[in-house]
Regions:
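P-loop NTPase Walker
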Residues: 17, 23, 29, 37, ...
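Phosphoinositide-dependent membrane-docking surfaces
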Residues: 22, 26-53
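Helicase P-loop NTPase motor core
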Residues: 216, 224-229, 233, 499-501, ...
Length: 688
């Protein structure tokens, strides 16, 4: 049915609506030259009759939005038919509304049951469970040809229970899981009080109970991450969430893996005997040996740095015997020196130069780790400001990479990088079926893109097994970019793993609050670092960080030795090996109550000591001078553009090795780090 104004009325009302009709679930309004279709889910079902001197009008209303209500007025209509049309339109709307409610009533009870099930579930509620329900709801809405907004308008009271789970999913889940956690903490208080020599604190206990699809526990220096990993294994086993065979623990070094095995044996015992504790290399080898017919052999050359360097020397000697290759190197080095070498006539005498060979080995390792074609590498580099130089470098080292692959193939061997890549491919193709339901990674901040690809492949195998990733690490201590680690994989965890929960351990048992205040404030100057609170268990009012001239190191040691009532440990930390003091051996003999050791800041990671003296925090030394990026650096460069980002994290690592006091020594006015600590609001002592 339709109503239309006569020609006189149309002339008088100009461009206003002059015609209305009903068409299926729409009101169709027409004016001169245009038509508007108003669906019933936009109209609120109300219509107002308006009587004029000669004609009638109908006003239809939309649902109110933010306190405002839109309406549509059709004028110049024959009055005697307006009431009938209005009744017919309202009846059509009510029929449509009833049909929508009947449709909703088919699905609502199931939705309500799911939501109530979320609340009652006696376990951590993970994102994948809720997301599966949300996806099903979307399919239900498509089946009903209805939107969420329609459902809210049809049955607002019934939908009020469900709406928060749709609009504020993460917040509602977090609140629900927090309520569950309160009960679960009480259930497991005996385990948490006895698994270590001291009871776990609340943030550690909460970390143990996390069971989202992907979990990241940010564990600041000295916050007890190892205790969390051990307690989590005990919790999974004792709660029957997992059998020992369901758990894989990954570490980055053989020593770390052995230490973890020993802890499981000491703290949990036989029930944890079948937990798999591997390095990434052991895991890769396990996968390859299970999938491939022939035994896999790692090249002896790849296993030994000295043999690898010797291989690089041998290759370079042969390569430079080809005039075109030698000239290519000369031409490049004349424009862009490498390892302080220029392309002069004496270049041939540098074929065994340790720095040049170390550089070549580093580029070879990076190309091998990526496993890309030359064209793919060029695509990765093409937007770099130094593309011309980097592409020229690639031309130098690509033949070395090809020779390396040829050597491995002829010997029937592989290297670690090929092993990780092949293992990942086997998992992705389904040739290796992962038996694990829980994958736990220690020192996650040290992970590289290649290793993460293997972990993701294991977690994402499509079968009935839900695999939970539990990563423990600290982006503040990510200091191994030169070895392929990518801090962005930690700071971007939530973006990389959308179904995730991030939690942080809030108490350090290593250093006092005075060291903590300096170190935590310093590392968080970089806004790319994940923000977290790290309180110190030990509190004191006296400042514990002192800046002093480099020539006072012996005086500091003498004072510590005189005040010591028992043996004390002292770490002398340098940015590089050449910062090792010449008098170290004398000091070790001279100060009997001090156990003095020198380390680079990198080597000190994971260590703790009574006192730390950071040496030579001078301009160009610490932070180290920014050097031109080579292929390895350009291919692994972090997206973080904050000045000296990794050097700042390295300085944080150095400061947080100490339990009691830190001295930062420098010459002259020191580096930018010294200036920042002395000129900005840091609780430090400055000695002249």
């Amino acid at each position: 049915m339709q109503l239309i104004a006569n020609k006189t009325a149309q002339y008088l009302i100009q461009n206003e609506y002059h015609q209305v009709s009903l068409e299926s679930d729409f009101l169709v309004l027409s004016s001169r030259g245009s038509e508007e279709r108003i669906p019933f889910n936009v109209w609120n079902g109300k219509v107002k009759l308006k009587r004029g001197l000669f004609w009638g009008g109908l006003q239809f209303f939309a649902h109110p939005e933010e306190g405002k209500q839109q309406s549509w007025l059709i004028q110049g209509l024959p009055w005697e038919r307006c009431r009938y049309f209005a009744r017919l339109a309202v009846a059509s709307y009510q029929k449509w509304h009833h049909h929508q409610c009947v449709q909703l009533n088919k699905f609502l009870p199931e939705w309500e049951m799911e939501v109530r099930g979320f609340e009652r579930q006696p376990a951590f509620l993970n994102h994948s469970t809720v997301n599966a329900w949300l996806e099903k709801m979307n399919r239900d809405f498509l089946t009903m040809e209805m939107t969420l907004e329609d459902a809210l308008l049809r049955m607002p009271d019934r939908m009020s229970e469900i709406l928060p789970w749709i609009d504020d999913t993460d917040e509602v889940m977090a609140t629900r899981n927090q309520r569950w956690m309160v009960t679960e903490l009480e259930n497991w208080k005996v385990l948490f009080s006895q698994i270590e020599s001291s009871p776990l604190n609340l943030s550690q206990q909460q970390a143990v109970l996390l069971n989202d699809d992907n979990n990241l526990v940010l564990a600041g220096a000295g916050s007890g991450k190892t205790s969390v990993l051990t307690a989590r294994v005990a919790y999974l086993l004792q709660s029957h969430l997992a059998q020992a065979e369901d758990i894989l623990m990954l570490a980055f070094g053989r020593d770390a893996a052995e230490e973890m095995k020993q802890r499981l044996e000491n703290k949990i015992g036989l029930s944890a005997e079948q937990v798999t504790v591997n390095t990434f290399h052991q895991l890769g080898l396990k996968i390859l040996n299970q999938v491939e017919k022939d035994p896999v052999t790692i090249s002896p050359i790849a296993l030994d740095d000295n043999l690898k360097n010797a291989w690089c020397v041998d290759w370079l000697k042969k390569h430079w015997m080809t005039p075109t290759a030698f000239k290519r190197w000369q031409k490049h080095l004349q424009k862009w020196p490498i390892a302080y070498l220029a392309g002069d006539d004496e270049l041939g005498s540098h074929v065994e130069n340790p720095k040049l060979i170390a550089w070549l080995n580093k580029q070879l390792n990076q190309l091998s780790a990526m496993g890309c074609t030359k064209k793919e590498i060029q695509q990765r580099l093409v937007d770099h400001n130094d593309y011309t130089r980097l592409n020229s470098e690639l031309a130098l080292v690509w033949p070395c990479y090809q020779a390396w692959l040829d050597m491995l193939k002829s010997e029937g061997h592989i290297d670690f990088n090929i092993m990780i890549t092949k293992a990942t491919q086997h998992v992705m193709k389904g040739k290796f079926k992962a038996p694990w339901k829980y994958i736990m990674i220690d020192e996650y901040q040290d992970i590289s893109p290649q290793r993460l690809a293997l972990v993701k492949a294991l977690c994402q195998q499509k079968d009935e097994r839900n695999c939970v990733l539990f990563a423990v690490g600290d982006d503040w201590q990510s200091i191994y970019e030169f070895a392929g680690a990518d801090v962005d994989l930690t700071t971007g965890f939530a973006e990389r793993f959308p179904h995730s929960t991030i939690h942080h351990l809030d108490t350090t048992y290593r250093f006092n609050n005075q060291i903590g205040e300096v170190a935590n404030q310093f590392v968080q100057q970089n806004p790319a670092q994940l923000e977290k609170v790290l309180q110190s268990h030990k509190e004191q009012k006296a400042k514990a960080v002192t800046l002093a001239p480099s020539n006072t190191v012996e005086k500091i040691l003498d004072e510590l030795n005189r005040k010591a009532k028992s043996s004390q440990t002292v770490l002398l930390l340098g940015r590089n090996h050449y910062h090792k003091p010449e008098l170290l051996s004398e000091w070790q003999k001279q100060f009997a109550l001090l156990s003095i050791e020198f380390m680079t800041c990198h080597a000190s990671k994971g260590k703790e000591t009574d006192f730390v003296i950071v040496l030579s925090v001078d301009e160009g030394q610490f932070p180290a001078r920014v050097k031109a990026l080579h292929i390895d650096g350009a291919l692994t460069q972090s997206e973080d553009t904050f000045p000296y980002a990794e050097e700042r994290r390295l300085f944080y690592v150095a400061l947080t090795r100490a339990k009691k006091k830190v001295w930062i020594t420098y010459t002259g006015s020191g580096s930018s780090f010294v200036k920042e600590l002395t000129e900005q609001d840091y609780p430090v002592i400055v000695k002249k």
